[in-house]
From Swiss-Prot:
List of residues binding Mg(2+): E75, D77, D194
Gene from which the chain derives: cGLR
Enzyme type, top EC level: transferase
Biological classification of the source: Eukaryota, Metazoa, Ecdysozoa, Arthropoda, Hexapoda
Protein name: Cyclic GMP-AMP synthase-like receptor
SMART domains in the record: Mab-21 (SM01265)
Length: 396
């Protein structure tokens, strides 16, 4: 018998009534998002011939489309996937920064001298003197074509998107690899859309030194995430989002448990722990558990506590290895005092779980703020109002 069943209904209630996204919000925001993206992509393809040639599709990434979003469905991470012509002879090699690679265009000069490929001439402005694709130059190029393409809908610093008779006002903000389009709707709704230009490669370019995927998804992305050192502007961050999505899909209680862990992170103010770190805990669990689905089909309380304990083990070792390259410790950038405080908090949570096994509400203070507790838990006894099916993850 699962000794954590005493808090099962509480976890189900919180997952269903606090964490899970509202269907009406999801549907409404998806309609608006699709219309805005259609406008942007059409204008980019019309105004820039090289973008039109390289663009393939949008990858809808991030926690929202992984079914892991906590809160409101108003933040979207979108990768605009670009491809390079084979005749440029792209060569990907591992960089000396963990998680990064170099991309060299081995035949770029000969390629650009072919009359049929003159539309790619802007590529020569995106590489450094040694033929490596430059992150900052690519981001500058992308910023330029976005702003110039949207000029005809711009008034001052505001971009006006006309959708189904309504005006949605947008502003563009830069941060890291993303250009964030902040949208304000006529009804007061807000939406943040992160657009990132990424390059997509097939399996034959899989970089050495990174774990080989057994996934059905064989392509991977490189992301223009700049390093602080300006001399390293040809370092590209690897992204295996398609493989990770496949690994965590169809795993029973995995997604509800991960959403609970993210909710706990937010409630405890562990802001230095990125959502991707928590996702990585589950990626390692998926590999360690293997093909047996019985673990993920167990109760939500059991799957959640097992993940919390595994998370604590990583914290205790001061090492959370990047799933695709074990030598890359995701916790290396955290100060020891920060890690010590986080370890202490998680130990206290686990101690309360083990010692208060007759109090199903003992876990609540770690998952809900005082305001959330009043708003949600006063609606009725969670032991009676929730059932096991409320924890089902949302599919997109």
């Amino acid at each position: 018998m699962n000794k954590y069943n005493y808090m099962e209904n509480v976890l189900q209630h919180i997952n269903a009534n606090v964490i899970s996204l509202r269907d009406d919000e999801i549907k409404g925001n998806n309609i608006i998002l699709k219309e805005i993206l259609n406008i942007i992509i059409d204008k980019l393809k019309t105004k820039n011939i090289m973008f039109r040639k390289m663009y393939t599709c949008i990858f809808f990434g991030g926690s929202y489309y992984d079914g892991l979003r906590v809160g409101h469905p108003n933040e979207f991470d979108l990768d605009l996937l670009l491809t390079l012509h084979n005749l440029t002879k792209p060569i990907i090699t591992k960089a000396n920064e963990p998680g990064y690679v170099f991309l060299k265009l081995g035949n770029i000069n000969n390629f650009l001298n072919i009359d049929d490929f003159k539309m790619y001439k802007q590529l020569s402005n995106l590489i450094n003197k040694n033929g490596y694709l430059d992150v900052r130059k690519v981001l500058s190029w992308f910023e330029g074509i976005v702003t110039s393409s949207l000029n005809d809908i711009k008034e001052g610093s505001i971009y006006n998107f006309q959708i189904k008779g309504n005006t949605y006002k947008g502003t563009i903000h830069k941060g890291g690899p993303a250009f964030t389009l902040k949208i304000k709707g006529p009804n007061g709704s807000n939406m943040d859309i992160d657009l990132v230009p990424c390059f997509r490669f097939t399996e034959e370019h899989w970089p050495q030194g990174f774990k080989k995927s057994t996934s059905q998804q064989k392509s991977f992305f490189i992301v223009p995430k700049p390093l602080p050192d300006s001399t390293k502007s040809h370092y590209w961050r690897l992204s295996f989002q398609e493989q990770e999505r496949e690994l965590i899909n169809n795993k029973g209680r995995l997604k509800p448990a991960l959403r609970l862990l993210k909710q706990m992170r937010d409630t405890l103010n562990h802001h230095r722990i990125a959502s991707y770190y928590l996702k990585t805990v589950f990626l390692w669990q998926v590999e360690e558990i293997g093909v047996d689905q019985s673990h993920w089909n167990s109760s939500l309380s059991y799957v959640f506590v097992c993940a919390l304990k595994r998370y604590k083990e990583f914290l205790d070792s001061d090492n959370l290895p990047y799933f695709w390259e074990k030598k890359n410790n995701l916790l290396s950038g955290l100060h020891e005092d920060t890690l010590k405080n986080i370890r202490g908090s998680i130990l206290k949570v686990l101690t309360d779980i083990e010692s208060n096994n007759k109090d199903p509400n003992a876990i609540v203070k770690y998952l809900l703020t005082p305001e959330e507790q009043k708003r949600i838990m006063n609606g009725g006894n969670p032991q009676q109002s929730a059932n096991a099916e409320n924890g089902s993850c949302l599919s997109m």
